[in-house]
Amino acid sequence: MPLENFGSVLNFAEELETQDQLFYATVAANPACAEHKELFEQFAADAKKNIKTAQRTRRENVTEMILEPIKDFVRAPFCEECAGADSMSAEDALATARRLQERAVNYYTRAAEKIKALPEVSRALKTMGKKHNVQREKLAVL
């Protein structure tokens, strides 16, 4: 499904963050992942903040929206299933978390490029991408 405008880019960002929040909250409660519970709880809290950031960005910039469509940007490369988080081993949960962080960094980087016409929105997307990059680096050392 194509991401054709400002609203669809931010709506999809909100969907990704909601999926991430659910995944991290679920693996934080998974006894097999107890060793990384604090990290996953922090990631869930960060995802919740990112949802609010996406919503606020959409709300504050809707009047500046440019109707020019976004081209060549689709959801497919950023869709990832996270089923079974409640029964994953710690190793599988960390591997999935790494994939989710990589996906988020890629999405926010590409989205910021595609929405350059709205500098405030592009900046917000870049900032969210940087936050995910920090999380990705935390996961890389585990």
PLM segments and residue spans:
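Alpha-helical transition-metal enzyme core signature, strongest for iron centers
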Residues: 13-24, 40-58, 101-104, 125-139
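Domain-length accessory/inserted modules outside core catalytic folds
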Residues: 3-5, 53-57, 61-64, 91-94, ...
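The feature marks the first
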Residues: 1-26, 30-31
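Amphipathic alpha-helical coiled-coil segments and their boundaries
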Residues: 3-6, 10, 40, 87-90, ...
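Acidic/histidine-rich alpha-helical segments that form the ligand environment
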Residues: 13, 20, 26-27, 77-116
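Carboxylate-rich helix-loop segments that flank metal/cofactor sites and access channels
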Residues: 56-90
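Short loop-to-helix capping motifs
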Residues: 33-34, 117-118
